[in-house]
Amino acid sequence: MKLIKVAAAVLNQAPLDWTGNKERILAAIEKAREEKASVVCLPELCITGYGCEDAFHSMNTVRRAWKTLEEVTPATRGMIVSLGLPVLHQKGLFNCACLIVDGRIAGFVAKRFLAGDGIHYEPRWFKPWPADVVDELRVGGESFPIGDRCFDCGGVRIGFEICEDAWVANRPGAALASKATDIILNPSASHFAFGKLEVRKRFVLEGSRAFGTSYVYANLLGNEAGRAIYDGGALIATGGRLVAAGPRFSFQEVLVTTAVVDVEATRMSQARTASFQPRLEGGDASVVHTPFEFPAVMLALPAIQWADWETGQHVKEEEFTRAEALALFDYLRKSRSQGFVVRKASTRPCCRARSNG
């Protein structure tokens, strides 16, 4: 067995809150370290916040994101951590996940499929990265791999599906499977909608089964920018089995969910699959090799404990109530309001609720 402890971090971020976002990222990394996790996935665009809208087109946003990345990088020594940020490359802005290995930037994976329906307008700000294309990103005299990449970290291969990438028919995970990927990280900013958790569970479970991998899904939490609610809900699966699930609609700003996965078990599962055909070109330019020594960990049996309301008869009503409560609470504190005024449709006096602050 080759056991690895992985972690999915759920964060309640705010657009352009450079200090607060960095503090929450560092807190998540520290919590994962305390749990002895080696591989940590944080949400999509967690450095800037997902809801920056047209501020993504400001060079200051790009520069501050890179500065924050450099400030966080030393805190990842002895770990493998993914962070989300916008990256400017060849005059195109890309929604990227940066993989940091033992305190050094290993490279960047750019999102291939942009969310452009419903409440999402990613094509307004970002460019989709084409499949099988790799390049070098040059920043401050240094060069970093970027594009449709995967990473070989001490013999364990790690790839990415960034949020929408996993929701499409031609999802990148199939190509990652042919590259013998062991762990797929999915940093997401997936807003709450009724029944959406079941869809997420399906693509996480099916991705881990069909691609012969362990799958780590990390999501945003809370009312990030005033219009969309994120429910959190980290998920970790391996070989088609769900082995860990985090709480949803939490009022905590940082949550870390961990699980121990066996990469040798998923490798042999894929080897037994007659339809699986590995890529055998004798060296794949998309794979970034970097040394890393995984610490020994003890096997831990999965013990998923869903909240009672998640398995009750009134899930939809519970979701609505919890989503509204979290959304209003976050709006109150992030806008620094003193309270809400609730007006009844009658001649009775209005009812005013105040915060303790």
Language model: regions and residue ranges:
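Enzyme catalytic cores with a strong preference for nitrogen-chemistry domains
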Residues: 1-357
